[in-house]
C-alpha cells in the first residue's frame, strides 16, 4: 500500500502528532499492520491495522470486545496502583468524525489505530523460554479477566472457522 494512502487513513484518526513515516510491522498472516512513527519525541508512535473482515466478519463486535477487555484491565491495573498504563494495556484512538474506534473505507476495509507499546516484541520462532514466558503472560491476562462482568461476543464463528481463516490468508 502506498505511503500516501496510509497517511490519509491515519488522518481519519485523532492523532495529535506529526507523522514521519509509516512502515510494515511484523509479518502477520491475518491483518495488515503498520508502524506509524511520529516526529515529536514527546508523542507516542502508533500501530495502524487493517482488520481482515474475511476472518473477523463482525468487526464491530471485535472492537466492542476489545473495549470491554481493555476497560476492565485498565480498571484492574489502576486498582492495583499501576501508573504506567500505556505499557500494560492497549489504547485505541477515536476517529476524527466520531468517537468510533474504527474507520471503514468505502471498499469495505476496516482500520484501527492504537498507541504503540514501546519495547514490545514479537517472536517469529518459538523456543522453550519464550513459550514459557508467553504462557505466563497469557495466564496473567486470563486472571485479569476472571471477573469481567459481561458476556463477550464470539469473534469468529465456530462453523468452519479454520477453513475460513485459511481461505482468507
Model regions and ranges:
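Conserved ATP-binding subdomain of kinase catalytic cores across diverse folds
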Residues: 20-164
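Hydrophobic alpha-helical segments, chiefly the membrane-spanning helices
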Residues: 165-169
Amino acid at each position: 500500500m502506498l505511503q500516501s494512502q496510509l497517511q490519509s487513513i491515519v488522518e481519519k484518526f485523532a492523532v495529535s502528532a506529526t507523522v514521519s513515516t509509516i512502515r510494515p510491522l511484523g509479518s502477520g498472516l491475518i491483518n495488515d499492520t503498520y508502524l506509524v512513527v511520529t516526529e515529536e519525541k514527546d508523542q507516542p508512535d502508533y500501530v495502524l491495522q487493517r482488520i481482515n473482515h474475511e476472518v473477523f466478519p463482525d468487526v464491530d463486535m471485535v472492537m466492542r470486545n476489545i473495549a470491554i477487555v481493555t476497560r476492565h484491565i485498565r480498571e484492574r491495573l489502576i486498582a492495583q496502583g499501576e501508573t504506567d498504563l500505556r505499557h500494560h494495556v492497549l489504547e485505541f484512538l477515536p476517529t476524527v468524525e466520531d468517537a468510533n474506534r474504527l474507520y471503514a473505507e468505502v471498499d469495505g476495509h476496516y482500520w484501527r489505530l492504537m498507541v504503540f507499546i514501546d519495547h514490545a516484541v514479537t517472536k517469529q520462532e518459538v523456543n522453550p523460554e519464550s513459550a514459557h514466558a508467553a504462557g505466563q503472560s497469557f495466564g496473567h491476562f486470563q486472571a485479569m479477566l476472571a471477573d469481567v462482568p459481561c458476556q463477550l461476543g464470539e469473534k469468529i464463528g465456530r462453523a468452519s472457522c479454520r477453513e475460513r481463516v485459511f481461505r482468507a490468508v
